[in-house]
Design a protein with these regions (language model features):
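Active-site-proximal gating segment of KS-fold condensing enzymes and close homologs
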Residues: 78-99
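Conserved "HGTGT" condensation-loop signature of ketosynthase/thiolase-family condensing enzymes
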Residues: 1-78, 97-99
């Protein structure tokens, strides 16, 4: 009997950082005001060249490393997003192809 499970986890955050101090420069607010009300310190933004599948690919590589397996050992990719690369093609297929 086969079993299914999560053997590793991974994440990826884009390099572009926008801090509360950056907000202070463009709108009437402060780091303290934002932080006390939301807990947010910084936000990460993908570049215009990066798609959802690029971010997911970075996370997948970390998950594979965390699981101590090879890319070829991955049997299934489940990727849920509200921001797909394309309307008609799932980002999971793109990540699978990149792996």
């Amino acid at each position: 009997m086969q079993s299914i499970g999560i053997k590793g986890i991974g994440y990826y955050v884009p390099e572009n950082v926008f801090t509360n101090f950056d907000f202070e420069k463009i709108i009437d607010t402060s780091d303290e005001w934002i932080r006390t009300r939301t807990g947010i310190i910084e936000r990460r933004f993908a570049s215009k060249e990066q798609a959802t599948s690029d971010l997911a690919y970075g996370a997948a590589l970390k998950a594979i490393e965390s699981a101590k397996i090879k890319k070829e050992d991955v049997d299934m990719i489940i990727l849920a997003t509200t921001t797909p690369d394309y309307i008609a093609q799932g980002a999971a297929c793109i990540v699978q192809n990149k792996l």
